[in-house]
């Protein structure tokens, strides 16, 4: 009986998940209107940017040349993301581009998500410490009231080959970890020494008896 109940609950949860995500599964990137103008300019003049240190100035606004300038009336939120360029997707299926938005893995790093403002927006973004080494561009999505993407814009061309920038990730070497490692090493040595002294004292007491 318990097994049947568990199976029923599992199927119910699965069906609820499917129904809630069904709308997103039908949405294709090629159906979105390219009506947002996005730029991404590293503050550093040249060279590879360092994660956790260097900054990128990002701007976005509705394209004035858009055939449907009123498309922004559907926007409730603007979501800006950092996306992998094709060169950083080679042999990395977990970063693959897919026309089905719910399957697309090319833009996993959210930079900012905020209420839509019709006036041109700008952001000086410091590259996060969690950003891996790679080549990137920036993409912005216009999100409607139901949480669906209805428009987009990106800082590169359609082939994602221009206006790219490269990031070098931190090595993962932290002073805090070194201190912790040293502390535990010393603690282990001291503990071993104390254990040795106690055992030796115990042996002497046994000999006297």
UniProtKB/Swiss-Prot annotation:
GO cellular component, one term: plasma membrane
Induction (UniProt): Not regulated by nitrate.
Plastid listed as a keyword: no
Gene Ontology biological process terms in this record: nitrate assimilation; response to nitrate
Signal peptide: 1-22
One GO molecular-function entry: nitrate transmembrane transporter activity
Subcellular location: Cell membrane
Domain of life: Eukaryota
Membrane topology of the entry: Single-pass membrane protein
Pfam families: NAR2
UniProt cross-references to InterPro entries, sorted A to Z: Transptr_NO3_Nar2 (IPR016605)
Task of the protein: Acts as a dual component transporter with NTR2.1. Required for high-affinity nitrate transport.
Protein name: High-affinity nitrate transporter 3.2
Lineage: Eukaryota, Viridiplantae, Streptophyta, Embryophyta, Tracheophyta
């Amino acid at each position: 009986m318990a097994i049947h109940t568990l199976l029923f609950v599992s199927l119910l949860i699965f069906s609820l998940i499917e129904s809630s995500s069904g709308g997103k599964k039908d949405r294709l990137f090629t159906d979105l209107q390219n009506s947002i103008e996005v730029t991404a300019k590293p503050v550093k003049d040249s060279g590879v940017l360092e994660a956790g240190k260097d900054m990128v100035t990002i701007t976005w606004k509705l394209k004035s040349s858009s055939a449907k300038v009123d498309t922004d009336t559907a926007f409730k939120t603007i979501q800006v993301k950092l996306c992998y360029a094709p060169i950083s997707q080679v042999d990395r299926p977990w970063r693959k581009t897919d026309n089905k938005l719910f399957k697309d893995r090319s833009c996993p790093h959210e930079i900012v998500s905020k209420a839509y403002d019709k006036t041109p927006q700008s952001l000086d973004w410091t590259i996060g410490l969690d950003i891996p080494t790679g080549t990137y561009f920036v993409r912005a999505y216009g999100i409607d009231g139901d949480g669906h993407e209805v428009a987009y814009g990106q800082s590169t061309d359609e082939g994602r080959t221009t206006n790219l920038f490269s990031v070098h990730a931190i090595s993962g070497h932290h002073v805090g970890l070194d201190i912790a490692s040293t502390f535990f090493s010393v603690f282990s040595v001291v503990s071993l020494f104390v254990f040795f002294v106690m055992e030796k004292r115990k042996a002497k007491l046994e000999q006297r008896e």
